[in-house]
Amino acid sequence: MDAPAYWGVAGRPVSHSITPKLFSIVGGAMGLVQAEQIFVEASGDEEFYSKVEMLEGDLWLSCTTPLKHSPHSKLGVKGPQGVNAINQLMRSKGVWKGASTDGTGFVSACRHIGVEPSGSILRIRGGGSTARSIAAAWSSEGGSIIPEKGRRELVRGPWD
């Protein structure tokens, strides 16, 4: 796997993010040549696109609020059904891809400690994009969701 020309974080605010440092640590452990770390301050698709279109080469970005909730239609990517958020964007050879990794990461961590989603019930508090991503991934692996009230209600989705 080749490292991108750039990796970092996009959204607003992003200056506090440790994501570029984490990319460097993981990239170094994988033997990837270090990419240039970037912070892309953007609140929506148009502002984001205007800032990254001038960058040459491949690009890996973690997206935070509010950018992760943008429709990303100009880039041709969309989040998983019900999640409606993308927290990872990648441009490789000029083609954009997006993913919501919170849920798959949570399921992987649960499996690592011996907890299988299939047939298990997960109580989940709130309804933000991380909660929706986890609910979608958990239910797609055969688990059930019991929503708990948080700052936001967990909307209806593929986990119902």
Task: Place the predicted regions along the sequence by residue.
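Charged interaction patches that mediate protein-protein contacts
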Residues: M1-D2, K149
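Phosphate/diphosphate ligand-binding glycine-rich loop within oxidoreductases
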Residues: D2-I113
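Hydrophobic beta-strand segments of well-ordered beta-sheets in folded domains
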Residues: A5-W7, L59, S120-L122, G143-I145, ...
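Glycine-rich adenosine-cofactor-binding loop
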Residues: G11, G98-G103, C110-G143, P147-K149
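Short, aromatic/basic amphipathic alpha-helical patches
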Residues: F23, L75, W138-E141, G157
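Short secondary-structure boundary/hinge segments and terminal tails
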Residues: D45, G128, V155-R156
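Active-site rim beta-loop-alpha module in soluble metabolic enzymes
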Residues: E148-D160
